[in-house]
């Protein structure tokens, strides 16, 4: 156990472009810094770079917690600014990024110069991260959802939930198309709750929402509601309408639209 105290600063960044729904977290100790997730746009990569520089700390590690573009498209800018920093991700996330990168560039071509120009080399992480002697346990990744992890810092009771947690957003379910996938997700949420965290950072949130365990409850409630409405809705459009009716103030409508179509077999997502 380290004698230093860690500070956690959460940023609300673009996803989709123009909507601040994606988080990144800068963790700083006495001398060093850890960044969790690397933004969706080059512009936000520059914003994170400025925050790291202003912190006065040495960036040692960037952890890319998931393989979707809003977790890593901004990494190139950060890597150029901090060439000594290591960029880490789990092996399955690295594999997913390598296979999907070109397709994602095409899908988000409207970003233009805000798109990355290259992939940053990611080193495989299979165990825990450390910052000045503080361990960040890599948890999750069960058989049913092997590419989904979160970080747990026990001394500060801090949980960085990544793609598993949403706060006042429509939950992105397009990548968990089966009931078994979503049941495995709920099991992970129950595992998080059992840790009794104080600080909880969801991967996606509306700015201004609380960084506490209510994000776990909100995500779990939404997944339960999704199953209820899925059973009743005749098609994807009806399912989206039902979700919007239940959650009128949630952001990321696109998640309810695409997730409903995928769950109803009207489209595939990969």
Region locations from a protein language model:
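Conserved beta-strand hairpin/beta-sheet module of binuclear metal-dependent hydrolase folds
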Residues: 3-54, 150-162
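Divalent metal-coordination and catalytic microenvironments
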Residues: 27, 37, 52, 66, ...
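Short acidic-hydrophobic surface loop/beta-edge motif
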Residues: 27, 126-131
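Active-site neighborhood of phospho(di)ester-bond hydrolases with catalytic His/Asp-centered motifs
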Residues: 36-38, 60-68, 88-91, 159-162, ...
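Metallo-beta-lactamase
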Residues: 40-41, 135, 142-143, 148-217, ...
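Accessory terminal helices/loops
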Residues: 96, 194-199, 207-270
């Amino acid at each position: 156990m380290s004698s230093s105290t860690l500070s956690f600063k959460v940023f609300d960044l673009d996803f989709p472009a123009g909507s601040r729904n994606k988080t990144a977290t800068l963790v700083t100790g006495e001398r060093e810094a850890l960044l969790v997730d690397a933004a969706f746009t080059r512009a936000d990569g520059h914003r994170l770079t400025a925050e790291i520089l202003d912190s006065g700390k040495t960036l040692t590690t960037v952890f890319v917690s998931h393989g979707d573009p809003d977790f890593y498209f901004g990494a190139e800018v950060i890597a150029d600014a901090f060439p000594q920093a290591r960029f880490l991700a789990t092996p399955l996330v690295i594999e997913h990024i390598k296979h999907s990168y070109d397709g994602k560039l095409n899908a988000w071509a409207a970003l233009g110069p805000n798109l990355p120009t290259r992939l940053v080399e990611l080193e495989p992480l299979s165990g825990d991260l450390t910052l000045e002697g503080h361990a960040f346990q890599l948890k999750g990744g069960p058989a049913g959802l092997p590419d989904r992890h979160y970080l747990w810092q026990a001394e500060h009771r801090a949980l960085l939930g990544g793609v598993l947690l949403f706060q006042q957003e429509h939950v992105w379910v397009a990548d968990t198309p089966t009931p078994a996938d979503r049941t495995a997700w709920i099991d992970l949420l129950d595992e998080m709750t059992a840790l009794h965290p104080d600080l909880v950072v969801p991967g996606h949130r509306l700015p201004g929402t609380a960084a506490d365990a209510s994000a776990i409850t909100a995500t779990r409630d939404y997944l339960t509601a999704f199953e209820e409405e899925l059973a009743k809705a005749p098609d994807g459009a009806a399912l989206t309408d039902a979700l919007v009716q239940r959650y009128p103030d949630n952001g990321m409508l696109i998640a309810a639209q695409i997730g409903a179509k995928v769950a109803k077999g009207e489209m595939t997502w990969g």
